[in-house]
């Protein structure tokens, strides 16, 4: 019982995932055959941050998505990390629900475009966990 309590206390310190990120993960699953985890630490831009020149088409998808989120920051009150939106998935088709909320529409379009891009881009296992200092100039 003590171990369970300690375990639960430790889990309480884990921050919740942003809802928008969860929606993006679900879109990736809808559009393609790879899980969202396949894109963590891929190339120079897939995952947190990014620098240099994208290494391939898939990495360019991540680069474009990063820049799309940067543009969303210019919409008053729009926070890409927490803003949610509505969409439908009929695999592999994703449709953003029409809304008057400019931020929600913009973010849904960013995520939809990226998910479709991921699904259509070749996946090169040699671009996983590459050295940013060597490959992302």
Swiss-Prot record:
Its cofactor is Ca(2+). One of its GO terms (cellular component) is extracellular region. Disulfide bonds join 30-89, 44-136, 46-62, 61-117, 68-110, 78-103, 96-108. It is found in: Secreted. SMART domains: PA2c (SM00085). It comes from the Eukaryota. GO terms for molecular function: calcium ion binding; calcium-dependent phospholipase A2 activity; phospholipid binding; toxin activity. Ca(2+) binds at residues 45, 47, 49, 66. The keyword Lipid metabolism applies. Residues 1-11 form the signal peptide. Keywords: Blood coagulation cascade inhibiting toxin, Calcium, Disulfide bond, Hemostasis impairing toxin, Hydrolase, Lipid degradation, Lipid metabolism, Metal-binding, Neurotoxin, Presynaptic neurotoxin, Secreted, Signal, Toxin. The active site is at 65, 111. GO terms for biological process: arachidonate secretion; lipid catabolic process; phospholipid metabolic process. Pfam families: Phospholip_A2_1. Its EC number is 3.1.1.4. Expressed by the venom gland. Binds 1 Ca(2+) ion per subunit. Residues 12-19 form a propeptide. Belongs to the phospholipase A2 family. Group I subfamily. D49 sub-subfamily. Monomer, or homotrimer. Was firstly described as a trimer, but has been reinterpreted with the possibility of being a monomer. Snake venom phospholipase A2 (PLA2) that shows anticoagulant and neurotoxic activities. PLA2 catalyzes the calcium-dependent hydrolysis of the 2-acyl groups in 3-sn-phosphoglycerides. This is Basic phospholipase A2 3. It comes from Bungarus caeruleus (Indian krait).
């Amino acid at each position: 019982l003590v171990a369970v309590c300690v375990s639960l206390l430790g889990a309480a310190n884990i921050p919740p995932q942003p809802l928008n990120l969860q929606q993006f993960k679900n879109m990736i699953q809808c559009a393609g055959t790879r899980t969202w985890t396949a894109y963590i630490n891929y190339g120079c831009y897939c995952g947190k941050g990014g620098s240099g020149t994208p290494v391939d088409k898939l990495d360019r998808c991540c680069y474009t998505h990063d820049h799309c989120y940067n543009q969303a920051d210019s919409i008053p009150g729009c926070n890409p990390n927490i803003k949610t939106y509505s969409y439908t998935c009929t695999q592999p088709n994703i449709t953003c629900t029409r809304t008057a909320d400019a931020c929600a529409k913009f973010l849904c379009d960013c995520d939809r475009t990226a998910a479709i891009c991921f699904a259509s881009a070749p996946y090169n296992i040699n671009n996983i966990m590459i050295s940013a200092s060597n490959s992302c100039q």
